[in-house]
Amino acid sequence: MRIGHFQLTNCLIAAPMAGITDRPFRALCHGMGAGMAVSEMLSSNPEVWRTDKSRLRMVHVDEPGIRNVQIAGNDPDEMAAAARINVASGAQIIDINMGCPAKKVNRKLAGSALLQHPDLVKQILSAVVNAVDVPVTLKIRTGWSPEHRNCIEIAQLAENCGIQALTIHGRTRSCLFNGEAEYDSIRAVKQTVSIPVIANGDITDPHKARAVLDYTGADALMIGRAAQGRPWIFREIQHYLDTGELLPPMPLGEVQRLLDGHIRELHDFYGPGKGFRIARKHVSWYLQEHAPNDQFRRTFNAIEDASEQLEALEAYFENLA
């Protein structure tokens, strides 16, 4: 699949997830077979551009793979400025967020709230596309509510504005993450526009990935929550798409190696004073399958020292072996 002049190595993309798809996680997903990994959402508000939080969320020129930054906001001029700043710092693709269902984002008329205002959507898309000389993509939901699904209208508008790829999550904003994603709307959009369409939502295993690709005709898949604690899902899916066969479960020793490396990267990236806090949620996700009771996770979450976290994980896996 191509986005502008960029050729992805495969059709699997790691979704932007706030507080999760930071630089260490993006690099891990890339190493585990993702064709591209999108950054955490960055606000277009200029008041926060120079904060430590925004600085850490920005991509860096030495990152592996295609550097794709997602921005969010509701002011066309601010969005254009945010796009220019991120391109100057190394972004090779700009993704616009019009799919986030979070209340704090929607209250500011950003994220999926914008789907209720096609005229403003057009202004934002046009402003960003005209502001930068890199491909601009868009991520949306199927609409604001099941009664107001307008993804076909938004998709046509996006194509006319020069958007070069469109990701659609198969739920409306009012659905949040409840129920099951539906793919009829994604299929309808794919049959309507000529730009690449990326399907997103509830793609949890290789069989589901194959089924969604076949049903929707999508050009690619975006995987989010299913990669939490299981970044090797990209490798599993790609192997199945290529061969029709499932890979064996990840050996416990390999899980330990990946987890240890991920936690060390988090400690290095955020510093010892913050890295150990960020590491807690990732460890919890990794160990869901291997720690059915919460005792170790509760013990681990009480640790407030980076080196002690690594020692605790080593001891934990030794006991499992």
From Swiss-Prot:
EC number(s) given by UniProt: 1.3.1.-
Cofactor list: FMN
Record-listed FMN binding positions: 16-18, 70, 139, 200-202, 224-225
CDD domains, per database record: DUS_like_FMN
Catalytic activity of the protein: a 5,6-dihydrouridine in tRNA + NAD(+) = a uridine in tRNA + NADH + H(+); a 5,6-dihydrouridine in tRNA + NADP(+) = a uridine in tRNA + NADPH + H(+)
Enzyme class label: oxidoreductase
Keywords from the named record: Flavoprotein, FMN, NADP, Oxidoreductase, RNA-binding, tRNA processing, tRNA-binding
Pfam families documented for this protein: Dus
UniProt keyword annotation of Flavoprotein present: yes
Purpose: Catalyzes the synthesis of 5,6-dihydrouridine (D), a modified base found in the D-loop of most tRNAs, via the reduction of the C5-C6 double bond in target uridines.
Entries under HAMAP family matching the protein: DusB_subfam (MF_02042)
Family assignment from sequence similarity: Belongs to the Dus family. DusB subfamily.
Listed name of the protein: tRNA-dihydrouridine synthase B
Source organism: Yersinia pestis
Gene (UniProt): dusB
